[in-house]
Amino acid sequence: MTRLQQRLEEALANLPDALRTSLTPIINTEFKGVISKEQFQSLQADSQLSDKELRLALLPLAAAFSVAPISNFYVGAIARGLTGNLYFGANMEYNDVQLGQTIHAEQSAISHAWIQGETGISNITINFSPCGHCRQFMNELTTADSLMVQLPERNEKSLQEYLPESFGPKDLGIEGGLLAPLSHNLALETESPLLRKALEAANRSHAPYSHNLSGIALEMESGEVYYGMYAENAAFNPSLPPLQVALVHANMSREDILTVKSAALVEDHKGAISHLAITQSTLEALNPDVTLEYASL
């Protein structure tokens, strides 16, 4: 049994009987942190829990995906997409990498939803109050004005109540927002499957400030490939690099992120910044033998 599966089963064991019985067939060895709208409705009917109660009850399962070797502080988040599907997320840390590269649970859940094709988030449930960094990150979303935040033992509040007089994309003249469907039409002639996958990600990236359209693809020792696209933020620092989004993709797919063996990064050369150096250093900390292909378009 993997460490993740052990954590999931420990979380299951602490749930009310009716919910545990209904969840057990879902939380199997293939579970990748997504609960469909229909599954959620079925769980709610079987458990007789309210929408809020059920989301809060599921948080320990989301936190089971946490990778926290530095803090040993496990945070879970559940983002509900506009489709009604629920996406788990958890904080991620890396040994020997500066702390600015860590991923917060809210960022993880939202990135997970983005990877799965969601175009907005209606609510997010978290087991600890969102830090200022995450409040600003969420303010970039297409649905920032209507996004609701649920904490344990608290009434649901809007993001704007957590971030009064907020600064966001509209203050910089940007319409849309993070998770808006995009296709930038970047092109690259290459025989490399990893570069092609990274190009697909770059074409979905959100980079209206630096214009560094960028994406990455990671190949793991298992042979599976995971991708990530850049999620830029109006406040700059809360931006989430493409590598971090790809690591969320891998982690929520039950991969050990230390088993990345090769990667490919694609960037638009017209961008004001580059992710190349920090991507190289972070990948080398995960696996010193990793290979990295790079294309600046």
UniProtKB/Swiss-Prot annotation:
<keyword id="KW-0378">Hydrolase</keyword>
<dbReference type="Pfam" id="PF00383">
    <property type="entry name" value="dCMP_cyt_deam_1"/>
</dbReference>
<feature type="binding site">
    <location>
        <position position="131"/>
    </location>
    <ligand>
        <name>Zn(2+)</name>
    </ligand>
</feature>
<feature type="binding site">
    <location>
        <begin position="91"/>
        <end position="93"/>
    </location>
    <ligand>
        <name>substrate</name>
    </ligand>
</feature>
<dbReference type="InterPro" id="IPR002125">
    <property type="entry name" value="CMP_dCMP_dom"/>
</dbReference>
<feature type="binding site">
    <location>
        <position position="134"/>
    </location>
    <ligand>
        <name>Zn(2+)</name>
    </ligand>
</feature>
<feature type="domain" description="CMP/dCMP-type deaminase 2">
    <location>
        <begin position="189"/>
        <end position="297"/>
    </location>
</feature>
<dbReference type="InterPro" id="IPR013171">
    <property type="entry name" value="Cyd/dCyd_deaminase_Zn-bd"/>
</dbReference>
<comment type="function">
    <text>This enzyme scavenges exogenous and endogenous cytidine and 2'-deoxycytidine for UMP synthesis.</text>
</comment>
<feature type="domain" description="CMP/dCMP-type deaminase 1">
    <location>
        <begin position="50"/>
        <end position="170"/>
    </location>
</feature>
<dbReference type="InterPro" id="IPR006263">
    <property type="entry name" value="Cyt_deam_dimer"/>
</dbReference>
<protein>
    <recommendedName>
        <fullName>Cytidine deaminase</fullName>
        <ecNumber>3.5.4.5</ecNumber>
    </recommendedName>
</protein>
<keyword id="KW-0479">Metal-binding</keyword>
<dbReference type="InterPro" id="IPR050202">
    <property type="entry name" value="Cyt/Deoxycyt_deaminase"/>
</dbReference>
<feature type="binding site">
    <location>
        <position position="104"/>
    </location>
    <ligand>
        <name>Zn(2+)</name>
    </ligand>
</feature>
<dbReference type="GO" id="GO:0042802">
    <property type="term" value="F:identical protein binding"/>
</dbReference>
<feature type="active site" description="Proton donor">
    <location>
        <position position="106"/>
    </location>
</feature>
<dbReference type="Pfam" id="PF08211">
    <property type="entry name" value="dCMP_cyt_deam_2"/>
</dbReference>
<dbReference type="InterPro" id="IPR016192">
    <property type="entry name" value="APOBEC/CMP_deaminase_Zn-bd"/>
</dbReference>
<dbReference type="GO" id="GO:0004126">
    <property type="term" value="F:cytidine deaminase activity"/>
</dbReference>
<dbReference type="GO" id="GO:0008270">
    <property type="term" value="F:zinc ion binding"/>
</dbReference>
<dbReference type="InterPro" id="IPR016193">
    <property type="entry name" value="Cytidine_deaminase-like"/>
</dbReference>
<comment type="similarity">
    <text>Belongs to the cytidine and deoxycytidylate deaminase family.</text>
</comment>
<dbReference type="InterPro" id="IPR020797">
    <property type="entry name" value="Cytidine_deaminase_bacteria"/>
</dbReference>
<dbReference type="GO" id="GO:0009972">
    <property type="term" value="P:cytidine deamination"/>
</dbReference>
<comment type="subunit">
    <text>Homodimer.</text>
</comment>
<dbReference type="GO" id="GO:0005829">
    <property type="term" value="C:cytosol"/>
</dbReference>
<keyword id="KW-0862">Zinc</keyword>
